[in-house]
């Protein structure tokens, strides 16, 4: 019994040592986390340095203010990197010290375990095996976490590389697009720094909470367990002592009773001597056992005192480490505060630059020269070096007068010759010729198709962000070329009336022989799509006013017999940040004379398609009448629908799509904001729980898993919204900004068995125009 109790005590002490070893392993894991965080910061530094090199190679200007900002930012980042490297070396040194302490503790534990009495070798081997298994488990978990972090970094780097490729294609634009790209890159950099700051704050707070919780909770639990184990050992020893005393007393009473009852008349001294010797031997054996137990108790008491001293030393060391970490956290908070102040300064500078650019653009638009796109690099440098806003108005007046004088005498074509490597300078000083009024373009009702959509809803595509600058530059280059060739008259330098974007009318100017301007109000089909307010409301309003004035000037009629300029209407995209204006690639609008019919590609396509053979198609005319349906063709027990949809009143501005379905559920519509599913049945419900909606565009695909248990009632519909669209609360959201509505897109829905139940494809889309924008 004594040996068993001693063995239990040793097992308990071994468990306590294992728990301490686990604590040391946790501390080591924490230091490994810190080292990995340092590696992550180095990777972030590499990415930021790469971004800086790209920006440095992209911006070709003599702006000393921008270079100064870059130099200050580089010095700040380098100082932060040096601080991080110093802290990394300190953490590595601390890790080596802790590893040496762990090795010393392990050697001491092994020595103590070997010197302990009564511990079997197989139990010790089992302990070693358990420790080795736990260590391997911990190492495996750390490796898995490290690989997950690496995969995440690789995905981020791939995304950044793709963004860099798309951004490098836009470097050929003029000064305004280049400035916009620079501002966009700077905003992304600031956003990443803010995200990094928030992540660092979260990590610091989590580590602080973990340290405090670990120190205050586990220490008391360990002490309570140790005290409880000591009390149990003492109770077991006391119970064993009482039980042994009772057994000895009962045995002695039985022996005395036996001797009294069986003792003969003659006393046998030899037997008495033998019994006395046996009793002495038993007593000596008991005394030896008691001495051994006392020695063992003394050794255990010494070990307990030693462990108490070791725990107190570890507590002191950990408290010192915690204070050092708290100081480092305070330093990092101060650095984060300084970075936040710098970011606020950069944001203020960005706002000032945007306001300055907007004002210069307004002055250039009022000067009447559509070829002036942005201020020069000297103007940007002077704006960067300006300390207050007191001299802005004077500078505006001086710059505007200089620009008006320059644009009244010289017209330089730079953007058109940048692609061929030559620059042509010409001077045109003729005045606009009075011309009669021209009839506006009216839609041909016979070939106009309607669709339940907004009258001006440009098809969204992920490639559209890339092609906006090209569309803007192509419009300006076309205007400059035709102006230099004599097709377009030079716009007058007088101020043009400001037309508000919220008005529902458009002014069409007719110049008479006397030069008097007659205005006529025409219903504006674009009035229902006025952009809403945003953060840069003032800048957006100035851009809208300037673009409306420019379009108003470009819509003036031209001489009869001359070439009509190829003007593309400018549309404001509500989804773009700051209401970035884009040029829709609609077919060119030409004057329509009386008695003449302008054939289009889609007219011939409709005539040819009607002769190909029977197919299921439904064309909806503008009057609301439905054409006769033709026979249905079955494909894999499904139905294919060929249809057309109109996005505006022009006969050439509509979309054709083909959809196929098998069963009750079909994809009825795909727009930039949502994808609509419809239950075709009028009597039975459709269970779409677990279905997967797949949206493929280009070389990418996005899928959405519908909620389990989702049931569509008869003739009910479900909309899966894009992330950037306006939707009600609790709707199904896809992880994509806006759905692609080009001919390069395939939208399908699959059931739980991965069977295709319906798909939707656009077969033609005149709003997209050039297909070269979609090849990557």
Swiss-Prot record:
<feature type="domain" description="LTD">
    <location>
        <begin position="653"/>
        <end position="764"/>
    </location>
</feature>
<protein>
    <recommendedName>
        <fullName>Intermediate filament protein ifp-1</fullName>
    </recommendedName>
</protein>
<feature type="region of interest" description="Coil 1B">
    <location>
        <begin position="70"/>
        <end position="207"/>
    </location>
</feature>
<feature type="region of interest" description="Head">
    <location>
        <begin position="1"/>
        <end position="23"/>
    </location>
</feature>
<feature type="region of interest" description="Disordered">
    <location>
        <begin position="453"/>
        <end position="473"/>
    </location>
</feature>
<dbReference type="GO" id="GO:0005652">
    <property type="term" value="C:nuclear lamina"/>
</dbReference>
<dbReference type="GO" id="GO:0007097">
    <property type="term" value="P:nuclear migration"/>
</dbReference>
<dbReference type="GO" id="GO:0031507">
    <property type="term" value="P:heterochromatin formation"/>
</dbReference>
<dbReference type="GO" id="GO:0006998">
    <property type="term" value="P:nuclear envelope organization"/>
</dbReference>
<keyword id="KW-0175">Coiled coil</keyword>
<dbReference type="GO" id="GO:0005737">
    <property type="term" value="C:cytoplasm"/>
</dbReference>
<feature type="region of interest" description="Linker 1">
    <location>
        <begin position="56"/>
        <end position="69"/>
    </location>
</feature>
<dbReference type="GO" id="GO:0005635">
    <property type="term" value="C:nuclear envelope"/>
</dbReference>
<dbReference type="InterPro" id="IPR039008">
    <property type="entry name" value="IF_rod_dom"/>
</dbReference>
<keyword id="KW-0963">Cytoplasm</keyword>
<dbReference type="InterPro" id="IPR036415">
    <property type="entry name" value="Lamin_tail_dom_sf"/>
</dbReference>
<comment type="similarity">
    <text>Belongs to the intermediate filament family.</text>
</comment>
<comment type="function">
    <text>Cytoplasmic intermediate filaments provide mechanical strength to cells. Not essential protein.</text>
</comment>
<dbReference type="GO" id="GO:0051664">
    <property type="term" value="P:nuclear pore localization"/>
</dbReference>
<keyword id="KW-0403">Intermediate filament</keyword>
<feature type="compositionally biased region" description="Polar residues">
    <location>
        <begin position="518"/>
        <end position="536"/>
    </location>
</feature>
<feature type="domain" description="IF rod">
    <location>
        <begin position="20"/>
        <end position="371"/>
    </location>
</feature>
<dbReference type="GO" id="GO:0005882">
    <property type="term" value="C:intermediate filament"/>
</dbReference>
<dbReference type="Pfam" id="PF00038">
    <property type="entry name" value="Filament"/>
</dbReference>
<feature type="region of interest" description="Linker 12">
    <location>
        <begin position="208"/>
        <end position="224"/>
    </location>
</feature>
<feature type="region of interest" description="Disordered">
    <location>
        <begin position="518"/>
        <end position="544"/>
    </location>
</feature>
<feature type="region of interest" description="Coil 2">
    <location>
        <begin position="225"/>
        <end position="620"/>
    </location>
</feature>
<dbReference type="GO" id="GO:0005200">
    <property type="term" value="F:structural constituent of cytoskeleton"/>
</dbReference>
<feature type="region of interest" description="Coil 1A">
    <location>
        <begin position="24"/>
        <end position="55"/>
    </location>
</feature>
<dbReference type="GO" id="GO:0090435">
    <property type="term" value="P:protein localization to nuclear envelope"/>
</dbReference>
<feature type="region of interest" description="Tail">
    <location>
        <begin position="621"/>
        <end position="768"/>
    </location>
</feature>
<dbReference type="InterPro" id="IPR001322">
    <property type="entry name" value="Lamin_tail_dom"/>
</dbReference>
């Amino acid at each position: 019994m004594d040996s068993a109790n001693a063995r239990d005590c040793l097992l308990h002490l071994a468990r306590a040592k294992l728990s301490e070893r686990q604590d040391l392993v946790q501390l080591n894991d924490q230091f490994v986390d810190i080292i990995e965080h340092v590696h992550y910061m180095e990777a972030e530094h590499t990415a930021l340095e790469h971004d800086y090199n790209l920006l440095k190679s992209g911006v070709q200007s003599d702006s000393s203010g921008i270079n100064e900002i870059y130099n200050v930012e580089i010095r700040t980042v380098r100082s932060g990197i040096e601080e991080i490297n110093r802290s990394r070396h300190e953490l590595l040194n601390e890790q080596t010290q802790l590893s040496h302490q762990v090795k010393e503790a392990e050697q001491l534990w092994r020595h103590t375990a070997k010197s302990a009495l009564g511990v079997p070798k197989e139990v010790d081997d089992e302990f070693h095996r358990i420790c080795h298994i736990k260590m391997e488990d911990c190492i495996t978990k750390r490796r898995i976490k490290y690989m997950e972090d690496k995969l995440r970094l690789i995905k981020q780097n791939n995304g950044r590389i793709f963004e860099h490729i798309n951004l490098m294609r836009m470097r050929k634009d003029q000064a305004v697009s280049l400035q916009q790209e620079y501002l966009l890159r700077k905003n992304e950099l600031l956003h990443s720094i803010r995200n990094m700051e928030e992540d660092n704050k979260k990590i610091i707070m989590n580590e602080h909470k973990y340290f405090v919780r670990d120190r205050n909770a586990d220490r008391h639990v360990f002490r309570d367990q140790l005290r409880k184990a000591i009390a149990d050992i003492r109770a077991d020893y006391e119970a064993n002592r009482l039980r042994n005393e009772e057994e000895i007393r009962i045995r002695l009473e039985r022996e005395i009773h036996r001797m009294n009852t069986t003792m003969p008349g003659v006393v046998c001294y030899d037997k008495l001597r033998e019994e006395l010797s046996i009793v002495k031997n038993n007593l000596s054996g008991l005394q030896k056992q008691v001495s051994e137990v006392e020695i063992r108790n003394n050794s255990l008491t010494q070990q307990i005192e030693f462990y108490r001293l070791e725990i107190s030393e570890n507590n002191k060391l950990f408290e010192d480490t915690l204070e050092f970490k708290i100081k480092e956290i305070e330093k990092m908070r101060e650095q984060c505060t300084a970075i936040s102040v710098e970011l606020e300064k950069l944001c203020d500078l960005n706002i000032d630059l945007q306001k300055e650019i907007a004002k210069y653009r307004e002055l250039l638009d009022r000067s009447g020269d559509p070829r002036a796109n942005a201020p020069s690099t000297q103007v940007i440098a002077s704006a960067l070096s300006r300390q207050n806003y007191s001299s802005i108005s004077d500078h505006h007046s001086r710059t505007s007068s200089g620009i008006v004088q320059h644009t009244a005498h010289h017209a330089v074509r730079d953007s058109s010759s940048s692609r061929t490597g030559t620059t042509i300078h010409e001077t045109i000083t003729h005045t606009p010729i009075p011309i009669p009024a021209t009839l506006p373009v009216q839609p041909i009702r016979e070939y106009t198709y309607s669709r339940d959509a907004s009258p001006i809803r440009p098809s969204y595509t992920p490639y559209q962000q890339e092609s906006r600058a090209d569309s803007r530059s192509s419009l300006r280059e076309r205007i400059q070329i035709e102006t230099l060739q004599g097709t377009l008259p030079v716009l007058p330098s007088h101020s043009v009336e400001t037309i508000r974007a919220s008005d529902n009318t458009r002014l069409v100017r007719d110049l008479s022989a006397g030069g008097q301007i007659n205005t006529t109000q025409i219903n504006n089909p674009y009035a229902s799509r006025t952009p809403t307010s945003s953060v840069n409301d003032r800048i957006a309003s100035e851009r809208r006013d300037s673009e409306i004035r420019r379009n108003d000037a470009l819509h003036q009629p031209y001489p009869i017999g001359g070439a009509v300029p190829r003007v593309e209407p400018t549309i404001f995209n509500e989804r773009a940040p700051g209401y970035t204006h884009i040029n829709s690639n609609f077919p060119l609008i030409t004057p329509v004379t009386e008695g003449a019919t302008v054939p289009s590609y889609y007219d011939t396509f409709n005539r040819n398609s009607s002769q190909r053979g029977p197919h299921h198609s439904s064309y909806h005319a503008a009057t609301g009448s439905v054409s006769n349906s033709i026979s249905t063709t079955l494909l894999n027990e499904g139905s294919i629908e060929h249809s057309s949809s109109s996005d505006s009143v022009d006969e050439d501005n509509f979309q054709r799509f083909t959809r196929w379905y098998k069963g009750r559920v079909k994809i009825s519509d795909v727009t930039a904001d949502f994808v609509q599913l419809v239950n075709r049945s009028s009597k039975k419900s459709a269970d779409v729980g677990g279905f997967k909606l797949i949206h493929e565009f280009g070389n990418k695909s996005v899928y959405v898993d519908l909620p389990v248990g989702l049931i569509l009632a008869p003739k009910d519909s479900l909309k899966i919204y894009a992330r950037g669209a306006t939707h009600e609360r609790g709707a199904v959201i896809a992880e994509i900004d806006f759905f692609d509505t080009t001919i390069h897109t395939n939208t399908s829905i699959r059931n739980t068995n991965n069977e295709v139940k319906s798909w939707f494809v656009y077969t033609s889309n005149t709003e997209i125009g050039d297909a070269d924008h979609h090849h990557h």
